[in-house]
Amino acid sequence: MTAAMSISLDVNGERVDAQVLPRLNLADFLREHLQLTGTHVGCEHGVCGACTVRMNGEIVRSCLMLAVQTHGASVETIEGLSDGGEIADLQAAFHNRNALQCGFCTPGMLMAAQDLLKQDAEPDRERIRQHLSGNYCRCTGYQAIIDAVETTARARIGRRS
């Protein structure tokens, strides 16, 4: 029998102390232990992007990370970005551009899109495509998603002017 391990981390700005089994992945920890179900589990191989979260400021696939690897880290989920209002404009653009249908990929897409917009305030469509290429959507055909990210980038630039 494998013994549980202690971890301490910040999740969406709140300190979390937990006992976890060494093989528990971060996605399952977030969903099952913390009830943060916006992080979806799709492929469980790190290729679909549905489980994307931000760890120490970088996006990672939570299905490939063990919960014990987050000890001492800062993790942000889609709930943290949504509740804090950081992506309200991006969420509105996804809605207005019909960039979501079933919604399964949406949290990961929003996490990746916000990551891009933090790196590059004015990405062109090719850069948007490239940055989102690790996130799969089987419903929208991607054009509406790219439109939503581009619309958000333009609006944010306009607000700064």
Language-model features and meaning:
Residues 1-161:
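Signature of N-terminal electron-transfer/Fe-S-associated modules in redox systems
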